[in-house]
Amino acid sequence: MKSILSAKTLFLCSLLLGGTASADFSLDFESGGVWAGKNDVKIPGDTGDLFSLTDDLKADQPAAYFRARATWHINDRHDLSVLYAPLSMDYSGTFDRPIDFRDGVLNPNVPTQARFRFDSYRLTYRYNFIKTDRLTFGLGLTGKIRDAEISVSQPGNTLSDDNTGFVPLINFQLAWKITEQFSFLAEGDALASSRGRAEDVMAAIQWQATDNLAFRLGYRLLEGGVDSDDTYNFSLFHYAVVGATIRF
């Protein structure tokens, strides 16, 4: 029995790690500008007042952003990556009405400062179902830890709400090699449920400068939110993307 189990274990490991001798790694860095398209808030979700950070206040935009990913390309079929993707956006203005928020009240016609922070930490496994010289397509699973906070300040009064939680997502990647140097790249994480949704999707044109270095320009959409008794928040952000990938 032990010999059978050992054989099965070796077989499974060989499937996953086959070709590990040619395994390599990549580092991906992305930056650019981000614009707020929507940011609706009601906290608590069942008794608070609904307000919009983008409509009632004004966003300080575009805001600069940065994210980084490290990927272990186990072989042609299997990829394992970690991503750090922080995001913060500042808003300012005045409310035209009193707002019940968190455990207090935000007054109208008073200078108001707000900050929306949404930091994301993700671990992704992806299996490449198609892997040719011209086309790569893969699907996988992402485990995301979100660390979010909404804070609103008026003279002598600061109210904030933070939320940390785990979100499972479906990951995908499509890479189509148009010419020897240029490719179309689409990738992202997304999932929807009855209580909320999350989408982080990018489309870009990538230039293969050398065998180990590629640059890209593109667009990223970050959208989602939650609707619960504790929190109602749905936001939308548009990104102008500049990125680089180093493979070694």
Q: What does each model-found stretch correspond to?
A:
Residues F29-S31, A68-W72, L123-Y127, L141-G143, ...:
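Residues on the lipid-exposed face of transmembrane beta-strands in outer-membrane beta-barrel proteins
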Residues M1-S26:
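Cleavable N-terminal export/targeting peptides
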Residues Y84, D133-R146:
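Early exported N-terminus immediately downstream of N-terminal targeting peptides
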Residues G37-A63, P86-D119, R146-G165, Q173-A175, ...:
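Extracellular/periplasm-exposed beta-strand and loop segments of Gram-negative cell-envelope proteins
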Residues R197-R247:
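Predominantly the C-terminal beta-signal and adjacent terminal strand-loop region
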Residues F182-G196, L222:
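Transmembrane beta-strand segments that form the barrel wall of outer-membrane beta-barrel proteins
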